[in-house]
């Protein structure tokens, strides 16, 4: 703790976070909460994700960092899928940071670990994810802080959650 969990999928990108990252402006009794970004999926929400990316002032700098151009948005390649997943990570982090006032603002400098699960773990490497997170922290938060990146490629988190739910029934 504190942690955030990102589930980047085809239709949505979900973020689960520990409540110790939330400013006092949110009332919650749970130890954690979540947000679902319906328009930041990589397959079913592809066009919405691209639109959101094109409207972020830092995305073209990020694309340059990734050594691609905006033409990647129109490609149907494995490389394009990787870039879209990286953009989904970046855009969600922007939405939950002080950069964007549209959603809650999490204390991202206090995050010790970022766990990634979902389809993203089958497409991106740890290094590719860490590169995006480092870009976000440096560019948006002006910080050298680097949370530990953990890939849940076997969906262990969901298995544990399902088992605990059965015990409660």
Locate each region found by the language model.
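Helical "lid/coupling" subdomains associated with nucleotide-phosphate turnover
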Residues: 1-6, 13-169
């Amino acid at each position: 703790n504190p942690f955030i969990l990102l589930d980047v999928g085809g239709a949505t990108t979900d973020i689960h976070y520990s409540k110790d990252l939330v400013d006092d402006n949110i009332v919650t009794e749970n130890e954690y909460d979540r947000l679902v970004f319906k328009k930041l999926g990589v397959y079913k929400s592809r066009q919405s994700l691209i639109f959101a990316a094109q409207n972020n002032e830092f995305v073209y700098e990020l694309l340059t960092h990734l050594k691609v151009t905006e033409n990647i948005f129109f490609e149907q390649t494995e490389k394009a899928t990787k870039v879209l997943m990286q953009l989904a990570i970046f855009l969600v982090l922007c939405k939950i940071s002080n950069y964007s006032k549209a959603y809650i603002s999490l204390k991202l400098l206090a995050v010790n670990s970022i766990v990634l699960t979902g389809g993203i773990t089958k497409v991106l490497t740890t290094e590719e994810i860490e590169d995006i997170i480092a870009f976000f922290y440096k560019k948006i938060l002006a910080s050298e802080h680097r949370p530990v990146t953990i890939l849940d490629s076997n969906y262990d988190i969901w298995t544990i959650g399902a088992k605990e739910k059965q015990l409660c029934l």
